[in-house]
């Protein structure tokens, strides 16, 4: 992960987003940005050395690391929910007071990381190595870097004595990568700590970068809902040398073939419509016209083919189905008693899970195929763009990247944002780094 001027834009976004004036208030004390960035790099490298692989998580050590760092800055942080979350796990909460004239803003990140196969890395995955301007480590992209950027932004404002009209709330959750139990527990148990929070930002932004130039900054206002299913067919076990008609494997394969060939309907949500209208400025001629009115353009075969050829655009315009796992016999010469498949289904925010499931069962058209949910879809949301926070990001982005614009985006993956959105908080995904979506997706759970 390369750090490129991330502290100043993020800090100023916070400061400019708090008062109503056009520009951020000046610090009472000078802020040495280069020194602060060097310090942020050092803190991030130390944070990456805390192994918080999930499972099992062990985020309590990470929470203590953050608490101790904040304590050195005179910011008291609380470690919460160690009993509820189980051994080695915890939430972290801190608050920097403003003058209270406006509601608070929350900066949230998750402390856990996905497993890393050390044999596939060129460096130890928990070394926090700095090489050729890049920091290597599991979590450098997802999302310890943004967590430290958030903390250093708050530290910059505090050291600079920048007057705040809103409290700044810092939250670090465990278990985002597995079950979101950290955010769920925090939102359920500590809603009183969030009652005055108007805006919350965390991961989930999508930027477009070309040749190190930011084309647009995508603020995540929604995300798709995870609706994983297991499909199972039962049969009679027997020796494979004598084929039977109730072998569950070919019956399951036939069902999966029908599912794989099914084209889910296209649907344009309001945030996605704005996204296409905004990015149309980067596409001259006919293609720009298609994007400016994407709903009607999808009825044009040529426009439809071009638009859906982009895997991200395709994913934000429909529910998606990916066949990801198969289980049959554990021996070649045995017809198994059961065959199953796991299917990754992602729903657009405004889609009804029960209706989608009924449609998929009709597509499979076989009552012998049993559908079992593997995960309950989270609360759907689409946050507003006509807000002080969104306008603050637009102002600061113009100051630092005048040629780039800000738009709303939909995340095709999942975050902890729904846990907080159901409390009435406007939640946003913000990527403060100059990282394009292709590199981000390749590296976020990948090697090095």
Model region roles, listed by residue range:
Residues 53-55, 87, 98-101, 111-115, ...:
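Solvent-exposed loop/turn segments at secondary-structure junctions
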Residues 35, 39-43, 61, 65, ...:
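Extracytoplasmic/secreted proteins, especially bacterial periplasmic and envelope-associated proteins
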Residues 5-17:
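Bacterial N-terminal signal peptides
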Residues 45-53, 67-76, 155-159, 188-192, ...:
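Sec-exported extracytoplasmic/periplasmic mature domains
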Residues 21-28, 206-215, 219-448:
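Metal-dependent amide/peptide-bond hydrolase catalytic core
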Residues 134-135, 141-219:
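Acidic/histidine-rich catalytic neighborhood of metal-dependent amide-processing enzymes
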Residues 89, 102, 123, 165, ...:
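Short, solvent-exposed loop/turn segments at the edges of secondary structure
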Residues 22-138, 144-147, 157-166, 343:
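Acidic/His- and Gly-rich active-site-bordering loop/insert found
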């Amino acid at each position: 992960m390369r750090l490129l001027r991330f502290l100043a834009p993020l800090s100023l976004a916070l400061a400019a987003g708090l008062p109503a004036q056009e520009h951020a208030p000046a610090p009472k004390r000078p802020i040495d940005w280069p020194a602060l960035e060097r310090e942020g790099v050092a803190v991030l490298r130390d944070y990456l050395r805390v192994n918080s692989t999930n499972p099992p998580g062990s985020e309590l050590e990470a929470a203590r690391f953050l608490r101790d760092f904040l304590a050195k800055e005179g910011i008291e942080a609380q470690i919460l929910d160690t009993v509820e979350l189980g051994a080695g796990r915890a939430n972290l909460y801190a608050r920097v007071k403003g003058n209270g004239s406006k509601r608070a803003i929350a900066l949230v990140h998750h402390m856990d990381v996905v497993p890393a196969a050390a044999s596939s890395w060129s460096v130890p995955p928990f070394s926090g190595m700095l090489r050729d301007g890049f920091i290597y480590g599991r979590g450098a992209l997802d999302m310890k870097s943004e967590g430290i950027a958030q903390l250093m932004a708050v530290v910059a404002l505090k050291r600079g004595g920048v007057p705040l009209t809103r409290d700044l709330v810092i939250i670090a959750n465990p278990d985002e990568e597995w079950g979101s139990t950290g955010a769920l527990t925090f939102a359920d148990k500590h809603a009183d700590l969030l009652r005055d929070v108007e805006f919350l930002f965390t991961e989930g932004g999508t930027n477009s970068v070309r040749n190190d130039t930011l084309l647009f900054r995508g603020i995540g206002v929604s995300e798709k809902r995870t609706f994983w299913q297991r499909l199972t067919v039962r049969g009679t076990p027997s020796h494979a040398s004598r084929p039977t008609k109730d072998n569950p494997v070919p019956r399951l394969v036939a069902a999966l073939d029908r599912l794989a060939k099914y084209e889910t309907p296209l649907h344009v949500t309001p945030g996605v419509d704005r996204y296409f209208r905004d990015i149309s400025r980067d596409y001259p001629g006919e293609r720009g016209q298609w994007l400016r009115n994407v709903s009607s353009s999808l009825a044009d075969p040529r426009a439809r083919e071009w638009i859906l050829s982009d895997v991200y655009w395709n994913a934000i315009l429909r529910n998606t189905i990916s066949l990801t796992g198969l289980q049959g016999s554990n021996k070649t010469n045995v017809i198994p008693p059961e065959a199953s498949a796991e299917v990754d289904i992602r729903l657009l925010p405004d889609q009804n899970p029960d209706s989608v499931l009924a449609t998929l069962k009709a597509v499979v058209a076989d009552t012998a195929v049993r559908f079992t949910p593997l995960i309950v879809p989270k609360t759907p949301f689409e946050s507003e763009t006509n807000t002080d926070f969104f306008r603050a990001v637009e102002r600061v982005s113009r100051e630092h990247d005048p040629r780039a614009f800000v738009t709303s985006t939909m995340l095709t993956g999942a975050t902890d944002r729904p846990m907080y959105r159901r409390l009435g908080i406007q939640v946003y995904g913000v990527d403060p780094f100059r990282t394009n979506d292709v590199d981000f997706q390749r590296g976020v759970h990948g090697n090095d």
